[in-house]
Amino acid sequence: MTRLVILDNEAVQALRDPAHPKHRLVISHAQVIVSRKRRAAAIELVVPTAVRVEAGWDRASSAWVLPNRLRIADIPLDTANASTAAAIRNQTGVSVADAHLGAVIQSALADQITVITSDPGDMRLVAGDRKVTVAAI
């Protein structure tokens, strides 16, 4: 079974800032993922690049050292994801970042998808017909 864990904007911001009120909660999710990877579980932690931009995550900046160490993979807004995201945005009116996140959910090959988010309603909306686990922060 393959698992995909996707971060939304607030989860990314909380990872960076130890003073963020949700920092501990997001760190605890990240620790679970790291421990499962150590046990050779097929799990990947990702961030859509539009979410990364919205959060201000510059991988070259020393301010983002902790998220950079977690080996969170970028999911680019390529042609296919852009078309899906545009359709999601047109249907729902969500932000570009949330639409990109929805495109990642809808195109994922993983058996199980989890989204760490501060907006569970929007994540269920952009997921379309895909079953997702929403970890609300």
Please state what every model-predicted region is:
Residues 1-45, 56-70:
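Short, well-structured N-terminal submotif of metal-dependent ribonuclease cores
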Residues 2-4, 110-137:
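Acidic, PIN/NYN-like endoribonuclease modules and their adjacent C-terminal/linker elements
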Residues 11, 51, 81, 100-101, ...:
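Alpha-helix capping/helix-boundary segments
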Residues 43, 71-73, 113, 132:
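Short, conserved active-site loop motifs that form the nucleotide-linked donor/cofactor pocket
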Residues 47, 55, 114-117:
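Short, hydrophobic beta-strand segments that form beta-sheet elements in well-ordered domains
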Residues 51, 71-92:
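Acidic catalytic patch
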Residues 54, 84, 125-126:
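Phosphate- and divalent-cation-binding pockets in alpha/beta enzyme and binding domains
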Residues 95-114, 122:
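Acidic, metal-associated active-site segment
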